[in-house]
Amino acid sequence: MNIKIGQPAPDFTLYDSTKNKITLSDMKGQNLLLLFFPLAFTSTCTAELCSIRDNISFYNNINAKVFGISVDSLHTLAKFKSEQSLNFPLLSDFNKNVSSLYGSLYEMFSYNMQGVSKRSAFIIDKEGIVRYAEVLENASEQPNFKNITLLLEGLK
């Protein structure tokens, strides 16, 4: 499925790395940034998420909640979050349903790995509407954070 700007964000429930259940529709009233990433402990993913960590005060100041999402297990994400001192939730899409729902799943990734999340960014506004959607085919690229921050600032 391809997500289109202006459509309601598909609802989902996933567990975070501390085993809390997170349901998207429960987040209405907050602007959200969903960041799908291929795999924990890889260089580009680490750089991307550490950049968010280092700038989390920006997101907090504009009342935007950030979630990282990958197909890694809860345990892998917990270790990754701890080792990188990440200060926002990481959600496990181990069964790949949400990555698929958001059009963010490689059928075949490098080294013949199947079912890895594509690096993607989605902004969902307070009403649950998709305001930004960027799905990257090249896992070594990062989302356009300049556009993301400008849009989020406008949604305050």
Language model regions located:
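Chalcogenol-based redox active-site neighborhoods
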Residues: 1-156
